[in-house]
Regions:
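Conserved tyrosine-mediated DNA breakage-rejoining catalytic core shared by Y-recombinases
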Residues: 3, 8, 12-64
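Residue-level marker of regulatory loop/turn positions in helix-turn-helix DNA-binding domains and
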Residues: 43, 109, 113, 117-118, ...
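Active-site/catalytic core of tyrosine-dependent DNA strand-transfer enzymes
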Residues: 53-112, 186
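C-terminal secondary-structure termini that scaffold catalytic or DNA-interacting sites
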Residues: 35-39, 44-45, 49, 64, ...
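C-terminal catalytic core of tyrosine-transesterase DNA break-rejoin enzymes
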Residues: 2-9, 119-145, 152
């Protein structure tokens, strides 16, 4: 929800894909185009290298993972996670719905029970759009194919993308609010 990455990009994220950007005091991840995904054949969706920019929330999570594994950013029993949409994710959804219900004194939206990991990527994209981030920058941050974007970024361009990602940082209470519109059934 803070990086726009796909499930397997998170599960199989490797420390050797991290690139330090000292002029910005941060790092980014560059997932290789031949990344195999869950079955070692799915690869990065658009066939290009995938730049993963970290906003402040994502950076703090990555920093907490340092030292847990020499190879994997998010290890599970010494190797990469297989998938995130498992029983733990389902239990977390139930806990989140219950907490929301307790805080708001009304039932949680039924959608809480069916939120998928990929929905977090969509949420990141929607929040970027609501924050006024340009389409070109949204494509770069979401890893969508864009003919004018390459895997070569200047420090200023990376700084701009980090700034855009921070516009939707979960720690910023001034972040964009999304209103879900639905048509009433006739």
């Amino acid at each position: 929800v803070n990086t726009g990455t796909r499930e397997q990009e998170v599960c199989k994220l490797r420390w050797d894909w991290e690139i330090s950007v000292p002029e910005l005091g941060t790092s980014v991840f560059l997932i290789p185009a031949d990344f195999g995904g869950r079955h070692e054949r799915s690869g990065v969706k658009n066939g290009d290298e995938r730049l993963v920019v970290l906003n402040n929330v994502a950076k703090s999570i990555i920093d907490q993972q340092r030292g847990l594994s020499k190879e994997w950013v998010f290890p599970y029993n010494g190797s990469a996670m297989h998938r995130m949409n498992d029983s733990a994710w389902k239990k977390a959804r139930v806990r989140a719905a219950k907490l929301w219900q307790e805080e708001n004194l009304r039932p949680a939206h039924p959608g809480y029970a069916s939120i998928r990991i990929h929905d977090l990527k969509h949420t990141f994209g929607r929040r970027l759009r609501a924050a006024g981030v340009t389409e070109e920058d949204r494509k770069a941050l979401l890893g969508h194919k864009n003919g004018s974007i390459t895997s070569h970024y200047s420090g200023a361009e990376l700084g701009h993308l980090i700034e855009a990602a921070n516009m939707v940082s979960a720690t910023d209470s001034r972040g964009p609010v999304l209103t879900i519109l639905k048509r009433k059934q006739a």
